[in-house]
């Protein structure tokens, strides 16, 4: 299985680099940058398209993002809770549009903290 994560700047008028036919069967794609790097055809080739927040995705659609992106199959909570099945075969192409998952922030924060500790830099804040 290929895993593709896009994490560039969020672009209002994207010029996607990943198009139709680029995502092989069985791949998982996670976009952290809205629809900036996948074109609508690449999104439509997914067997299952999910997001972390359907309401937020709707808001951004109204703001002009995700113009060529099809409707989502589910939100990630529905899949995690078992209310909708996730991957059902090894051949499925699955895409997750992550609009603001706090887990990503926490993973990054831990790496930054560990790096600062290793270098003996940073400022401890009273929280």
Residue ranges, per PLM feature:
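Rossmann-like adenosine-cofactor binding region
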Residues: 1-65
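Adenosine-phosphate binding glycine-rich loop
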Residues: 36, 40-127
């Amino acid at each position: 299985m290929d895993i593709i994560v896009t994490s560039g700047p969020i672009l209002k008028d994207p010029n996607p680099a990943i198009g139709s036919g680029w995502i092989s069967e069985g791949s998982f794609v996670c976009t952290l940058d809205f629809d900036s790097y996948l074109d609508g055809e690449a999104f439509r080739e997914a067997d299952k398209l999910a997001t972390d927040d359907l309401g937020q995705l709707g808001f951004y659609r109204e703001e002009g993002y995700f113009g060529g992106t099809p409707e989502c199959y589910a939100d990630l909570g529905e899949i995690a809770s078992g209310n909708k099945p996730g991957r059902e075969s090894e051949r499925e192409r699955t895409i997750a549009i992550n609009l603001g998952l706090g887990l990503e922030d926490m993973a990054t924060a831990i790496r930054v903290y560990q790096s600062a500790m290793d270098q003996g830099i940073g400022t401890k804040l009273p929280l």
